[in-house]
Amino acid sequence: MTFQTFKRFVLMSVFFMTTSAVIYAQQSTMQGLIGQSLAKLQQPTSESILNCIAEMKRIDDMFPDSIQPKFQIALQSLNYSVMNPHAPQTENLLKETEETIAKMENIKHADPSDICTLRGFL
C-alpha cells in the first residue's frame, strides 16, 4: 500500500515539474519574440512600426492570455498615430487600440496604471 502511495506521489511530482517547465518555456519564448520584434524599431519608420504591430498581433494570437503583446500593440499603434496623424491607417489603428485596451481591462493580472496610461494617450 505504501509503494502505491509513493508511486502516485512521484508521478504527481513529475507532472507538476513538467507543467511548470512548459509554462516557463512559453513565457521565455514570448519574451524572445517580443524582444525580436521591438529590436527592429531601432530606427522607427512608419513601415517598421506597422510591421511591429502586425508581429505583435501574431504573438498575441499565440499567447491570448498574456498582457504584454496587447500592451505593445496599443503602445506602438499610439506611437504610429502620433508620428503619422494624417496617414490612412491612423483612424483604424486608434479604433483597434481602443478595443485592445478594453481587452486588457478584462485580464485579471493587468496593471491598472498601464491601462490608464494608454487610455490617457488615446
Predicted regions and their residues:
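Surface-exposed, polar helix/loop patches in the mature regions of secreted/periplasmic/lumenal proteins
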Residues: 90-122
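Helix-turn-helix repeat elements of alpha-solenoid scaffolds
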Residues: 42-56, 87-99
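N-terminal segments that cap or nucleate solenoid repeat domains
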Residues: 29, 33, 51-62
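Bacterial Sec-dependent N-terminal signal peptides
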Residues: 1-33
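Amphipathic alpha-helical repeat scaffolds of TPR domains
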Residues: 27-39, 64-84, 109-122
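Generic secondary-structure transition motif, activating predominantly at the C-termini of alpha-helices
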Residues: 14, 38-42, 105
